Each structure stands twice: as C-alpha cells, then as structure tokens.
C-alpha cells in the first residue's frame, strides 16, 4: 500500500508488489519487454520488513549505485528477519533508520528526483510492542532519488470481498475463515495474505494444503 503523501503518483514511485512482480514474473528487466522496469541510480526502499529487503537487494543487483532502506524506527524495531538484514548489508545495502518520507519532488519530465524525509525519534511502545516513531519537529532532509519503492505493508484487495455477497470479512478487510480455511460461504475457501494480512509464502502454501484437504473431505462425503 501507499502512504498518501505528495508525489507518490510520480513516475519512478511504485509499490513493492508492482516492482517485484514486474521484475520476477513479467521480464521487466528486459528493455524490449512490454513494460520494462525503470532503473535507478539512487533507489530508496521505504519500509523495514522482509519485502523491503527483497526489493532493495533486487535494486542493487540491477545496478543501483545507492540502494537505501528508509525506515521510520531504529534497526532494532525492524520486522525483517535478522538474517535478511545481514544479507542486505553484505550486499552493500545502505540503511537510513529514524527517517520517514513526507513528500517526493519531480524533475522536468515528471519523474521522481528527490525525497523529503522527516527525521524521527522513538517514543513509547505502541500496540505492536515496538517503540512508536515520533517526528522531530522542524527537522527534515532532502535526498536524491530517481526511484522509490514503497514497502510499508500490504492491504487486502477489496475486489473479492466487495463483489461476493454474504462473504464475511474482518474490519481490516481480510476474509474470515474457520480452522479448515472455509469462509462464511461453504463453497469458498481462502488462505494466505487475504486471510492473514501480509505474511509469508510458506504460510500461504500451508493454508492452501489445509484448504485442499478440507475441500477433498467435503466433496468425498457427498
């Protein structure tokens, strides 16, 4: 998801989902492809989770001179696995913690050229148990950036919940399921991120196997 700040609609600013999907599944690193991905020399990846690490390491491997993680908390509060952070550092990834973007500026062609970052400090712990990020009043910096990948979290695609009558969803928009991954509609099973929110491929596969077993049992009993 995006952060709702000025400049997020500029060329060169994209979500981690779009970036990684295009690079890994759509041959976007091929300049002759239908939708080639933009290459950046100064790439900022916003976020501190595993997806952010995937995106920033991808940018570095694609030739970025500076591939930088921008995270609003300290490194200790990063949700990414420790080994992911260490692997990123080993590849030359730079980390700018306690900073948060508040605006992006464009060049004359409408492509992002720089990011305005708010300097942050840490306050009291929030509901996640991590210390909450607090803006330092009057302190910002401007950094060059010809590409920005936003990896601050995911939200469920609203199309399915809104288009399927009678489907129970949580207040966060995820599909509510029972232990067999069956939804409020007996013919519909769900798993992965649409149930859990942002999670891992491993958990999604496990959900799929559980749902498949439940579907097989339901069909076999008829």
Language model feature labels by segment:
Residues 1, 98-111, 120-124:
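A conserved short coil-to-beta-strand element within the FAD-binding core of flavoproteins
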Residues 9-40, 125-198:
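FAD-site-proximal beta/loop scaffold in flavoenzymes
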Residues 14, 94-96, 116, 189:
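General small-molecule cofactor/ligand-binding pocket signal
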Residues 28-63:
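Rossmann-like NAD(P)H-binding beta-loop-alpha module
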Residues 48, 71-74, 193:
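Cofactor-binding loop segments of dinucleotide-utilizing enzymes, especially the Rossmann-like FAD-
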Residues 55, 194-222:
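A conserved FAD-binding loop/helix module that cradles the flavin
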Residues 56-103, 222:
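Rossmann-like dinucleotide-binding cores of NAD(P)H-dependent redox enzymes
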């Amino acid at each position: 998801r995006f952060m709702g700040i000025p400049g997020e609609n500029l060329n060169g600013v994209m979500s981690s989902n779009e970036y990684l999907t295009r690079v890994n599944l759509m041959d976007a690193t091929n300049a002759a492809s239908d939708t080639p991905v933009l290459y950046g020399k100064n790439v900022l990846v916003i976020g501190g989770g595993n997806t952010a690490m995937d995106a920033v390491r991808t940018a570095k491997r694609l030739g970025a001179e500076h591939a930088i993680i921008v995270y609003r908390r300290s490194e200790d509060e990063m949700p990414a696995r420790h080994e992911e952070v260490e692997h990123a550092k080993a590849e030359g990834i730079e980390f700018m913690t306690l900073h948060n973007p508040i605006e992006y500026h464009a060049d004359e062609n409408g492509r992002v050229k720089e990011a305005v970052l708010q300097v942050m400090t840490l306050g009291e712990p929030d509901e996640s148990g991590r210390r909450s990020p607090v803006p330092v009043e009057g302190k910002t910096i401007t950094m060059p950036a010809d590409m920005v990948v936003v990896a601050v979290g995911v939200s469920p695609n609203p199309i399915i919940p809104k288009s399927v009558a009678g489907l129970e969803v949580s207040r966060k928009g995820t599909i509510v399921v029972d232990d067999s991954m069956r939804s409020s509609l007996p013919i519909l099973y769900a798993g992965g991120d649409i149930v859990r929110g942002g999670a891992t491929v491993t958990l999604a596969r496990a959900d799929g196997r559980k749902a498949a077993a439940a579907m097989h049992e339901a069909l076999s009993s008829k």
